[in-house]
């Protein structure tokens, strides 16, 4: 098993404090995109940190609580479906990241950002491919971003039943396609996305929509 993330990249920045930044929700067909920004205390690193996608829901929930308790500062930023439509998903993710960093109680000297795109943030940026598997700060940010977005989608399931948002969180799933074909788009669907268009087009042809 490969080793988990550590603080090597944070220390290599040569400046402090360093925040980790990561997003959640670039791929779904519905809901906002979220981003977490976390400045960890090097002396209080939660055990078990890793890429949020590699953790169980129970582990993520426990780590989210611990991260918020021990971090020097943390914040989650969002970009709405309207902003996604206006800016495109890449730049909307960057907007969510900027909001997360700007919301920190402590101004970071440096930001480690997951991926290979250097978004414009309120501090110098270093991109890290697969950063959520390498950097504790990025891993922590990925957990906060995912947990925050998952809660939004669970709430959306109660507001807009029939799509299965609580289960798939807006991603591709059979129940999601069936809901779109039967009900049409909800107010939180990303209407410009090809899978949404395709499901609606198929429903129109087959007369499946409950209008």
UniProtKB/Swiss-Prot annotation:
EC number of this enzyme: 3.1.26.4
Enzyme class, spelled out: hydrolase
Cofactor binding note of this UniProt entry: Manganese or magnesium. Binds 1 divalent metal ion per monomer in the absence of substrate. May bind a second metal ion after substrate binding.
Subcellular location: Cytoplasm
GO biological processes: DNA replication, removal of RNA primer; mismatch repair
Keyword annotations from UniProtKB, A to Z: Cytoplasm, Endonuclease, Hydrolase, Manganese, Metal-binding, Nuclease
Keyword Oxidoreductase: no
Reactions this protein catalyses: Endonucleolytic cleavage to 5'-phosphomonoester
UniProt keyword Metal-binding, yes or no: yes
Cofactors that this protein relies on: Mn(2+); Mg(2+)
Residues reported in the UniProt entry to bind a divalent metal cation: 22-23, 114
Gene Ontology MF term list: manganese ion binding; RNA binding; RNA-DNA hybrid ribonuclease activity
GO cellular component terms, A-Z: cytoplasm; ribonuclease H2 complex
Signal peptide (from-to): none
Described purpose of this protein according to its UniProt entry: Endonuclease that specifically degrades the RNA of RNA-DNA hybrids.
UniProt xrefs under PANTHER family: RIBONUCLEASE H2 SUBUNIT A (PTHR10954), RIBONUCLEASE HII (PTHR10954:SF18)
Family that this chain belongs to: Belongs to the RNase HII family.
Name of this chain's protein: Ribonuclease HII
Naturally occurring in which organism (per UniProt): Caulobacter vibrioides (strain NA1000 / CB15N) (Caulobacter crescentus)
Classification lineage: Bacteria, Pseudomonadati, Pseudomonadota, Alphaproteobacteria, Caulobacterales
């Amino acid at each position: 098993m490969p080793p988990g993330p550590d603080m090597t990249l944070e220390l290599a920045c040569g400046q402090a404090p360093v925040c980790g930044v990561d997003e959640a929700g670039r791929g779904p067909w519905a809901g906002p995109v979220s981003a977490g920004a976390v400045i960890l205390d090097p002396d209080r690193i939660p055990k078990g940190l890793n890429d949020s996608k590699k953790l169980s829901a129970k582990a993520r929930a426990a780590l989210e609580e611990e991260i918020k308790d021990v971090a020097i500062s943390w914040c989650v930023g969002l970009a709405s479906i309207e902003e996604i439509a206006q800016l495109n998903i890449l730049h909307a993710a960057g907007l969510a990241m900027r909001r997360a960093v700007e919301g920190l109680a402590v101004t970071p000297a440096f930001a480690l950002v997951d991926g290979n795109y250097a978004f414009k943030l309120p501090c110098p940026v270093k991109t890290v491919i697969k950063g959520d598997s390498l950097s504790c700060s990025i891993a922590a940010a990925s957990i906060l971003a995912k947990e925050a977005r998952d809660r939004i989608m669970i709430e959306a399931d109660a507001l807009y039943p029939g799509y299965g948002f609580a289960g798939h969180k807006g991603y591709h799933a059979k129940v999601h396609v069936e809901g779109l074909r039967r009900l049409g788009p909800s107010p939180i669907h990303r209407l410009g996305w090809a899978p949404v268009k395709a499901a609606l087009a198929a429903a129109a042809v087959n007369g499946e929509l409950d209008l």
